[in-house]
């Protein structure tokens, strides 16, 4: 009986490992399609408050459906920090458009603009909110001024050779030079 139980447990262990991806990063590899194309859809200055305007929501949703991008890049002022003054409202505002991308299964990268952190949710708080989405391929970054400095390699259709390397750089909130 012990031998049978041991065999069953071994088979279950092998099967459970076999269906797991090699790593979380393997699922997020950006690569060209078999057609040799890689389409990036950029949204800038969405900048609505926590209650995303219906027209904006529909425009984003329709654009993703029609253009079928391989990557979506949000290039700042993704929320209106002043219009989403609390962390809860910032999270709700981010969820309104990220839910579209998550449902479509399209990878998303982002950088911050000067209005994103005007409320109580700072950039680090917001980065953590974005990282809760499976479709998000960005990160906080290390050893550089700002939050969200990272690169995204884009590989050929086989995922073997890096063809492009996109850099996401935090331009900081406002340009402040010491006197």
Segments the model singles out, each with a brief description of its role:
Residues 4-22:
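Sec-dependent N-terminal signal peptides of Gram-positive bacterial secreted proteins and lipoproteins
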Residues 9, 49-52, 84, 120, ...:
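Active-site-proximal flexible loops/turns
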Residues 15, 48, 80, 116-117:
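Active-site micro-motifs of SAM-dependent methyltransferase domains
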Residues 20, 36, 162:
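Residue-level signal for beta-strand positions within conserved beta-sheet cores that form or flank
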Residues 24-91, 96:
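N-terminal active-site segment of His-dependent metallophosphoesterases
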Residues 26, 93-179:
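Extended active-site neighborhood of metal-dependent phosphoesterases/phosphodiesterases
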């Amino acid at each position: 009986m012990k031998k049978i139980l041991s065999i069953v447990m071994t088979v279950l262990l092998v099967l459970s490992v076999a269906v797991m991806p090699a790593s979380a990063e393997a699922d997020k590899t950006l690569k060209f399609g078999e057609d040799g194309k890689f389409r990036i859809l950029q949204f800038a200055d969405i900048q609505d408050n926590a209650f995303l305007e219906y027209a904006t929501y529909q425009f984003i949703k329709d654009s993703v459906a029609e253009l079928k991008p391989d990557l979506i890049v949000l290039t700042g002022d993704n929320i209106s920090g002043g219009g989403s003054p609390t962390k809860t409202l910032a999270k709700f505002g981010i969820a309104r458009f990220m839910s579209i991308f998550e449902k479509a299964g399209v990878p998303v990268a982002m950088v911050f603009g000067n209005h994103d952190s005007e409320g109580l949710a700072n950039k680090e708080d917001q980065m953590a909110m974005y990282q809760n989405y499976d479709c998000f391929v960005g990160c906080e970054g290390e050893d550089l001024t700002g939050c969200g400095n990272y690169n995204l390699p884009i590989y050929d259709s086989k995922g073997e050779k890096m063809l492009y390397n996109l850099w996401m750089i935090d331009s900081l909130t406002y340009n402040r030079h010491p006197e």
